[in-house]
A protein has these predicted regions:
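Helix N-cap at the start of a conserved alpha-helix in ABC-type nucleotide-binding domains
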Residues: 174-176
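Catalytic Walker B motif of ABC-type/P-loop ATPase nucleotide-binding domains
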Residues: 163-166
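ABC ATPase NBD coupling module
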Residues: 15-17, 70-86, 110-115, 229-233
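Short coil-to-helix segment of the ABC ATPase nucleotide-binding domain corresponding to the Q-loop/switch region
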Residues: 98-105
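Conserved signature/switch motifs of ABC ATPase nucleotide-binding domains
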Residues: 137-140, 158
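Helix-to-loop junction immediately C-terminal to a conserved catalytic motif
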Residues: 53
Length: 338
């Protein structure tokens, strides 16, 4: 587990005392989970990555890995504890004159691990990333996705509990991106890793993350599980992760629906239609498998029959069925009726 608390980072600047790049970031990533960190260019993602990997010392705050504050360490103590955090960058940064096996073995050799143990462990790592048959291949003989797999194996060589993946899929083709994301999820489950996935691609977040945090101008502005964000009508991050295309529609009431935080009745449309004599048009929908539950966001237009229930009654009934509803448009006659 990694726990980041009130993390701040500032730099000296000409004509000013300091420039504050990170402004009190707090974030917890449990074991066996992937948290994506998103945000625009200049938001502070790269600085956060440097602080997490302890390439930069935070100005204040703490970075705890398995309960120990690494941000207060220095020298040999810091170098020893830094092994708990493996890092994968956009470029795999492999040594071109060394084979895949030799690149993965480097951290172990620097640590002084005995050759027999190195051979055993590197073999296991190559198997873990699906490259057992590429042990003797040089980087130039590997595809971009395969090189990134070697980089991931090398990051895991010292058996970290935290893996930082900084734009690890940027620049890869769609097939390689899919394979790397699938690999990260497999490694999360196999080794119980806390994975921090820094990315600017919302599709990567949707496909791999359990939770997501958004940074803007050095502040942590939103965070939550994908299910929570998708099922929250007020979440701007959820709307960007799971967008709906605007459509022209007519009806007595136009609703935006979100679900996923509670069990959903699968026959909710027929239940409502029969109970209140409604005609429901599905205008747009975005449904994702989040963990073991379906979560979704949709827009519907509702035309009432002769019964015409109060719109508050309809929204309450939707809630009882496991759906959160937000009114986007309401006919004047219904507004007057309440």
């Amino acid at each position: 587990m990694i726990e980041i608390s009130e993390l701040k980072k500032h730099y000296p600047a000409p004509g000013r005392k300091t420039v504050e790049v990170l402004k009190g970031i707090s974030l917890t990533v449990p074991p066996a989970s992937i948290t994506a960190v998103v945000g625009p260019s200049g938001a502070g993602k790269s600085t956060l990555a440097k602080c997490i990997s302890l390439l930069e010392k935070p100005s204040s705050g703490s970075i705890r890995v398995n309960g120990e504050d690494l941000s207060q360490l220095s020298g040999d103590a810091l170098r020893a504890k830094r092994r708990a955090i493996g890092t994968v960058f956009q470029s795999s940064a492999l040594l071109q004159r060394k084979t895949a096996w030799e690149n993965i073995a480097l951290p172990l050799e620097w640590l002084g691990v005995v050759p027999g143990e190195i051979k055993r462990h590197v073999g296991q790592l190559l198997d873990s990333v699906g490259l057992s048959d590429k042990a003797n291949a040089f980087p130039a003989q590997l595809s971009g996705g395969q090189r990134q797999r070697v980089g991931i194996a090398r990051a895991l060589a010292l058996k970290p509990s935290v893996l930082l993946a900084d734009e690890a899929t940027s620049g890869l083709d769609p097939q390689a991106t899919s394979s790397i994301l699938a690999l990260l999820k497999q490694l999360r489950d196999r080794f119980g890793l806390s994975i921090i996935l820094i990315t600017h691609e919302m599709d990567v977040v949707r496909r791999a993350a359990d939770a997501v945090a958004e940074i803007s101008d050095g502040w942590l502005v939103q965070q939550g599980t994908l299910s929570d964000l998708l099922s929250s009508p007020q979440s701007s991050l959820g709307q960007r992760l799971f967008p709906l295309q605007p459509l022209e529609a007519s009806g007595d009431i136009l609703l935006q629906l979100t679900y996923g935080d509670r069990p959903l009745a699968t026959d909710w449309i027929s239940q409502l239609s029969q109970q209140y004599q409604l005609h429901i048009d599905l205008l747009a929908a975005h449904v994702e498998q989040v963990g073991e539950r379906l979560a979704g966001r949709m827009r519907i237009a509702v035309r009432f029959g002769a019964q015409r229930p109060r719109h508050q009654v309809l929204i309450q009934q939707l809630y009882q069925l496991g759906i959160n509803a937000e009114i986007l448009d309401l006919q004047p006659a219904l507004q007057e009726a309440g």
